């Protein structure tokens, strides 16, 4: 029989582990976390409120998550942190799609049916803020993807004609660009684990009223 207290025990244990880890990092001056896989795990737990069937994919390759009962099969997740004391748009990571020199990889980004961006404060295991793009609005990003890919391919061709290496072959999409193309009202947001009206959330971010890393 499943222990109904297990999720709370896991959260308490994880929080205590990070408290001890922070002490060790201060003592050693060494970053002791390598792959930051905890971020996708805890961000997925936040998204579960909206997507009850969501599952974190195992491994470093492939799609990050899926929620098949809600018809999400390819969810891409990005997370990041920042030293700021106030949460701003620039605190959020950019959505990055690499290997854009490969036509198959360029085509693949149009298959995603959900995107999430998560911001983590330093040595806090659960995200301070999560922004999710639901499948109903993902296609609004496609023209932006296409424009960025065309610019990148043109740069590839120019560099190759000059006998140079193609260089960094990724395209990036910022949260500001996502809002511009999707509309703040069409995104789903959480702050400190609680769902919040997306327009209210972005207004607070714009007004710099959300304190972090205190």
Question: Where are the language model's segments positioned?
Answer:
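Nucleic-acid endonuclease domains
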Residues: 1-214
């Amino acid at each position: 029989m499943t222990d109904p207290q297990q999720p709370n025990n896991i959260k308490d244990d994880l929080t205590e582990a990070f408290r001890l880890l922070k002490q060790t990092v201060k003592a050693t001056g060494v970053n002791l976390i390598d792959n930051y896989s905890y971020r996708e795990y805890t961000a997925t737990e936040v998204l579960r409120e909206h997507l009850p069937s969501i599952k974190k994919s195992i491994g470093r390759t492939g799609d990050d998550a899926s929620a098949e009962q809600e018809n999400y099969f390819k969810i891409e997740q990005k997370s990041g942190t920042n030293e700021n004391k106030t949460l701003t748009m620039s605190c959020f990571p950019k959505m990055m799609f690499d290997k854009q020199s490969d036509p198959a990889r360029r085509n693949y980004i149009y298959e995603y049916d959900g995107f999430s961006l998560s911001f983590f404060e330093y040595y806090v295991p659960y995200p301070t803020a999560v922004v999710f793009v639901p499948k109903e609005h993902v296609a609004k990003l496609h023209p932006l993807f296409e424009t960025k890919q065309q610019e990148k391919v043109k740069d590839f061709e120019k560099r190759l004609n000059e006998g140079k290496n193609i260089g960094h072959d990724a395209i990036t999409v910022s949260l500001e660009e996502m809002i511009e193309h999707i509309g703040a009202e069409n995104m789903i947001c959480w702050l400190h684990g609680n769902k919040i009206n997306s327009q209210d959330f972005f207004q607070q971010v714009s007004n710099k009223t959300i304190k972090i890393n205190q």
